[in-house]
UniProtKB/Swiss-Prot annotation:
One GO term (biological process): translation
Protein name: Large ribosomal subunit protein uL16
Keyword Nucleus: no
Domain of life of the source: Bacteria
């Protein structure tokens, strides 16, 4: 699973996932087809991996997949049946915070029908709304 190799600080505050993805990471840059977020939310490292495996299994040997997001935010929680107080819990997993317009995955080397179906299978593993996009001429 994806997670940072090392961080300056182990724990991070919750923060608010606001705004939209303006220019960076919003276009199909590497492949021919892309899966773009139209909702907002958090995607865990496990969900990123589950979607990648679904796509990889569907396209079999053909094509290439790029993952355009990385889970770099630690989420901590306290163990079950532990009283409140006594500090913040330990980091349990990592998430990628996603704003609308962010490109999640890209694919190349397959025909459009196969890419659409692979992205449909991947989107079922993700907790936010997505759309299929094709690279525009001149990009």
């Amino acid at each position: 699973m994806l997670q940072p190799a090392r961080r300056k600080y182990r724990k991070e505050q919750k923060g608010r996932n606001t705004g939209i993805s303006h220019s960076r990471g919003t276009a199909v840059s590497f492949g021919e087809f892309g899966l773009k977020a139209i909702g907002r939310g958090r995607i865990t490292a496990r969900q990123i991996e589950a979607a990648r495996r679904a796509m990889t299994r569907h396209i079999k040997r053909g094509g290439r997949i790029w993952i355009r997001i990385f889970p770099d935010k630690p989420i901590s929680n306290k163990p079950a049946e532990v009283r409140m107080g006594n500090g913040k819990g330990n980091p349990e997993y990592y998430v990628a915070e996603i704003q609308p317009g962010k490109m999640l995955y890209e694919m190349d080397g397959v025909d459009e029908a196969l890419a659409r179906e692979a992205f449909r299978l991947a989107a079922a593993k993700l907790p936010l709304l997505t759309t299929f996009v094709v690279r525009q001429v001149g990009q």
